[in-house]
Amino acid sequence: NKGLNVFGLIIDMIWSSLRYGSSFVDYFNFRFYEKDHQKRRAYATMGFMYRYHREINDQKKIREVDSKELFPHRFGAWCNKSYVFTKDDIDQFNHFLLSKVGQKIVFKDPNSTAGKSIKIVSVTKKENLIYLGNQHLKDFLNQEFALKHSIYCEDFIIQHNSIQAISPSGVNTIRIISMVTKEKTVVIIAALFRISVNCPIDNYSAGNLAAEIDPVTGIVLKGGIRKRSACDDYHDFHPITKMPIRGFEIPFWDETIVMIKEAAMIVPEVRSIGWDVAITNTGPILIEGNSQWNKDTFQIPAGYGKKDVLLRYI
């Protein structure tokens, strides 16, 4: 569509991989085909980020942040309620589900990333039988325990009314990237508003939008854009609800930043963490942390490379 020569494009992709450490996906997501050398070298690419995460974070401590099962124990003061059930806990699981009839539950695979394993189901009771979505409880258990030894789930989060108005299809979270400096202070190096587009999850890799937030004010600076930015442009308004994205002020922003700065010092050896935060009508909730946070969300919404931001703290 941009009139580029295919052969020349392929050669440039290979050259960029060797010169900048970019993957072929990076080449298109960062729109290298329309950028000169100076702009390309400003990006934190796949090769750079692999080295960066290993150097900046203590690899012996990252499980305390990344594990969905350990996370509530380390960061429980700010977390959404979570539960783990094994085959020996079937009775407890039944009682738990009975207490959730008429509500939704979020099931996750503790070892999965990018929202690939998330299932949001409604709990119902019909003729004294419990159903999870359209699936009978017995069938659900047989399916789950055939693949793993335990079930991990969380309470469904009811997001803030103003965020719900922008996109009601999923819980729209805030990604905040923190950095513990060598002087043991915490700085916020990026904040992004992740916005679902007719999707039950808001993960960037699922075709949703992300928009850059001013870390100081909590105001969205630009419209949202998809990860495959080569096929998209900025959306100042939500594609479906038509509610404004650019200029939106995230509720409870000051409280959110205080929470993140406190949480970042729980495991300070993991210096750089990408936090996922949900905003409810009563305040922020910490969902999870990621020691190998995604470079795409960090840079694509901004429209330029931010490698220099990361180099300041090595």
Regions found by a protein language model. Name each.
Residues 1-98, 113, 260:
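Conserved N-proximal alpha/beta basic substrate-recognition cap immediately N-terminal to
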Residues 219-239:
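A glycine-rich, aromatic-flanked flexible loop/lid motif
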Residues 115, 173, 194-200, 290-300:
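Glycine-rich phosphate/pyrophosphate-binding beta-alpha loops
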Residues 105, 187-189, 285-287:
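Protein kinase-like catalytic core scaffold
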Residues 81-82, 105-135:
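Glycine-rich phosphate-binding loop of ATP-grasp-fold ATP-dependent ligases
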Residues 132-226:
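Phosphate-binding site of ATP-dependent enzymes
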Residues 232-272, 279-314:
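C-terminal active-site "lid" helix and adjoining low-complexity regulatory extension at the edge
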